[in-house]
C-alpha cells in the first residue's frame, strides 16, 4: 500500500493492488481507479489506437476453423490483465473479456484482434472511475443498470 498526495485535488490517494483509492470527506465520496495499471498494461502490449466500444456487435467470437492460429502472441497474459481490470473497476468490459477468455486454450487471429480491440477501448476510457457517494436519495441498497449482454449474440435479439 502506498500513500501519496493528490496535489491537484488536495486529497490523499492510496494505491493498493493496482487500484487508486481517493476519498473526499467533504463531498462524502470514494473513487476507485485503475488508470495507472491500465496505462502500464497498454504500454506493455504496445497499444496506441483507440476504440469507442469494447467489442464489435456482429462478432460472437466463435472458434472458426478457417481462422488461422494466433501463433506466438501473449494472449493469456492479455486476457489475465483484462480479467483483473474487469473484476476490479471496469464492469463495462466484462462481457467482452468473457467472450475472448473462452478461447484462451487455442486463440485464433480473430480472438487476438478482439482482445486488442478491448485494449484499444481501455486506451480511450482509462480515466473512468467507480465513484461511491454517501448521499443516497432513495434507500434501495445498491441499484445498478447494466447492459451486460451487449453484443453477445446478434442471433438472440
Where are these regions (language model features)?
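Divalent metal-binding acidic/histidine catalytic loops
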Residues: 27-29, 33-157
Amino acid at each position: 500500500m502506498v500513500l501519496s498526495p493528490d496535489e491537484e485535488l488536495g486529497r490523499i490517494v492510496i494505491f493498493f493492488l493496482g487500484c487508486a483509492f481517493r476519498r473526499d470527506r467533504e463531498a462524502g465520496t470514494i473513487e476507485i481507479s485503475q488508470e495507472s495499471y491500465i496505462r502500464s498494461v497498454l504500454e506493455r502490449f504496445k497499444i496506441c489506437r483507440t476504440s469507442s466500444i469494447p467489442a464489435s456487435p456482429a462478432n460472437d467470437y466463435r472458434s472458426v476453423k478457417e481462422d488461422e492460429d494466433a501463433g506466438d502472441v501473449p494472449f493469456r497474459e492479455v486476457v489475465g490483465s483484462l480479467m483483473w481490470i474487469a473484476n476490479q473497476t471496469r464492469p463495462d468490459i466484462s462481457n467482452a473479456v468473457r467472450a475472448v477468455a473462452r478461447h484462451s486454450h487455442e486463440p485464433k487471429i480473430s480472438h487476438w484482434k478482439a482482445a486488442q480491440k478491448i485494449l484499444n477501448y481501455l486506451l480511450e476510457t482509462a480515466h473512468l472511475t467507480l465513484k461511491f457517494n454517501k448521499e443516497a436519495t432513495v434507500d434501495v441498497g445498491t441499484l445498478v443498470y447494466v447492459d451486460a449482454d451487449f453484443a453477445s449474440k446478434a442471433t438472440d435479439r
